[in-house]
Amino acid sequence: SYSMEHFRWGKPV
């Protein structure tokens, strides 16, 4: 899931 936890690094991982 692409939540805020994925986007904390600046890229969707």
UniProtKB/Swiss-Prot annotation:
<dbReference type="GO" id="GO:0005576">
    <property type="term" value="C:extracellular region"/>
</dbReference>
<feature type="modified residue" description="Valine amide">
    <location>
        <position position="13"/>
    </location>
</feature>
<feature type="modified residue" description="N-acetylserine">
    <location>
        <position position="1"/>
    </location>
</feature>
<comment type="similarity">
    <text>Belongs to the POMC family.</text>
</comment>
<protein>
    <recommendedName>
        <fullName>Melanotropin alpha</fullName>
    </recommendedName>
</protein>
<dbReference type="Pfam" id="PF00976">
    <property type="entry name" value="ACTH_domain"/>
</dbReference>
<keyword id="KW-0007">Acetylation</keyword>
<keyword id="KW-0964">Secreted</keyword>
<dbReference type="GO" id="GO:0005179">
    <property type="term" value="F:hormone activity"/>
</dbReference>
<keyword id="KW-0027">Amidation</keyword>
<dbReference type="InterPro" id="IPR013531">
    <property type="entry name" value="Mcrtin_ACTH_cent"/>
</dbReference>
<keyword id="KW-0372">Hormone</keyword>
